[in-house]
Amino acid sequence: MANTHVHHEYYAHVLSSMEERITTSILGRPDAPIEFPDIRARFEPYLGWLEQDFVMPVCFEDLIHNRQRTLERMLDHLEAGGYRLPTSRERALETFERAIDPTRSPTFREGKTGAWREHFTAEHRALFAQVSGDLLQRLGYE
């Protein structure tokens, strides 16, 4: 987590282990001076988008393992919806690449898929299932 992230101080100086950080990320911080809800509540405002015809869901794994094809599909989706690119397709793809540069993200850690398996304990898995409900299903992961 970048030191400019709003919750950096808490994660870096109050929480002392990866286990505590994962638990806090799942449960949120109801007492925090800066809003930080549980994992389900953080996703809830966006779940309705999945029901919209004009929305193209994109998962992190596709951006990592099939980046070029995924970015091309995103452009195809925009154009199919009537959007006219103001530049060449190649330039638009370059713009997309810059926009998803992980080094510019305050929450970027490693940029690899499946790493959660290395850190989630059985307790984390159970807690995540309890708090998130059907979130993984709605996002297409189960």
Predicted regions and their residues:
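C-terminal accessory extensions appended to soluble enzyme cores
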Residues: 119-142
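Short His/Asp/Glu-rich catalytic/ion-coordination signatures at enzyme active sites or charged loops
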Residues: 108-120
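Amphipathic alpha-helical recognition patches that constitute DNA-binding helices
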Residues: 66, 115, 123
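PAPS-dependent sulfotransferase catalytic domain
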Residues: 1-93, 97-110
